[in-house]
UniProtKB/Swiss-Prot annotation:
<feature type="region of interest" description="Domain II">
    <location>
        <begin position="65"/>
        <end position="143"/>
    </location>
</feature>
<dbReference type="GO" id="GO:0009378">
    <property type="term" value="F:four-way junction helicase activity"/>
</dbReference>
<dbReference type="InterPro" id="IPR000085">
    <property type="entry name" value="RuvA"/>
</dbReference>
<keyword id="KW-0227">DNA damage</keyword>
<comment type="similarity">
    <text>Belongs to the RuvA family.</text>
</comment>
<feature type="region of interest" description="Flexible linker">
    <location>
        <begin position="144"/>
        <end position="154"/>
    </location>
</feature>
<dbReference type="Pfam" id="PF14520">
    <property type="entry name" value="HHH_5"/>
</dbReference>
<dbReference type="Pfam" id="PF07499">
    <property type="entry name" value="RuvA_C"/>
</dbReference>
<keyword id="KW-0234">DNA repair</keyword>
<dbReference type="GO" id="GO:0048476">
    <property type="term" value="C:Holliday junction resolvase complex"/>
</dbReference>
<feature type="region of interest" description="Domain III">
    <location>
        <begin position="154"/>
        <end position="201"/>
    </location>
</feature>
<comment type="subunit">
    <text>Homotetramer. Forms an RuvA(8)-RuvB(12)-Holliday junction (HJ) complex. HJ DNA is sandwiched between 2 RuvA tetramers; dsDNA enters through RuvA and exits via RuvB. An RuvB hexamer assembles on each DNA strand where it exits the tetramer. Each RuvB hexamer is contacted by two RuvA subunits (via domain III) on 2 adjacent RuvB subunits; this complex drives branch migration. In the full resolvosome a probable DNA-RuvA(4)-RuvB(12)-RuvC(2) complex forms which resolves the HJ.</text>
</comment>
<dbReference type="Pfam" id="PF01330">
    <property type="entry name" value="RuvA_N"/>
</dbReference>
<dbReference type="GO" id="GO:0005524">
    <property type="term" value="F:ATP binding"/>
</dbReference>
<dbReference type="InterPro" id="IPR011114">
    <property type="entry name" value="RuvA_C"/>
</dbReference>
<dbReference type="InterPro" id="IPR013849">
    <property type="entry name" value="DNA_helicase_Holl-junc_RuvA_I"/>
</dbReference>
<dbReference type="InterPro" id="IPR010994">
    <property type="entry name" value="RuvA_2-like"/>
</dbReference>
């Protein structure tokens, strides 16, 4: 199991990055809540990882903090939630937001996440409720403030943001509407994704 990587970021294309660790480039999928906090291309970063082994692929998922990975692991234990859906959930909400939604039984908020239907949302509430009690007292689930690093280059922020939403499970028409709704001149793709996800909840 690969649990942690430290190296230089050589590519960033939400929600994926490539990190060079001693000459080996690891492709890593990240939830957007972690992607926002990556340093710029060419800079070094530490990410916590979870390896998913399938018949047709080995997928490496990365997280800015341990508590994000902890929640990811809890999510994929839930019946009907695979790694890609867990990634979409963690992209739409921070650990603290998700914990609050579960503890307060906010079913509607959970069903707004792409791929989460009513049954899955109900299952999440049943299986995860109680696991987040006293989240303020445990540093496993404490929301830390990060510095947001702005990308130094911009191919086409809207297009990149749209592609990231598609990768997270949104339909093309929905993704385009979401980006159009929050688009502002000079915004990076990461800002557009963050605003689009925030506005959709």
């Amino acid at each position: 199991m690969i649990g942690r990587l430290y190296g230089k970021i050589i590519e960033k294309q939400p929600p994926e990055m490539v990190i060079d660790v001693q000459g080996i480039g690891y492709e890593v999928l990240l939830p957007m809540t972690s992607f926002y906090h990556l340093p710029q291309v060419g800079e070094e970063a530490t990410i916590f990882t979870h390896l998913v082994v399938r018949e047709d692929a080995h997928l490496l998922f990365g997280f800015a903090q341990k508590q994000d990975r902890t929640l990811f692991r809890e999510l994929i234990k839930t019946n009907g939630v695979g790694p890609k859906l867990a990634l979409a959930i963690l992209s739409a909400m921070s650990v603290v937001q998700f914990a609050n939604a579960v503890e307060n039984e906010e079913l509607v908020k959970l069903t707004k996440i792409p791929g989460v239907g009513r049954k899955t949302a109900e299952r999440l509430l049943v299986e995860l409720k109680g696991k987040f009690k006293g989240i303020a007292q445990t540093d496993f689930f404490v929301e830390h403030s990060h510095e947001t690093m702005v990308a130094t280059y911009e191919i086409d922020a809207s297009e990149e943001a749209r592609d990231a939403l598609l990768a997270l499970g949104y339909k093309l028409t929905d993704a385009e509407k979401m980006i159009k709704k929050v688009h502002k001149s000079g915004a990076t793709s990461e800002q557009l994704i963050r605003d689009a996800l925030k506005a959709s909840l």
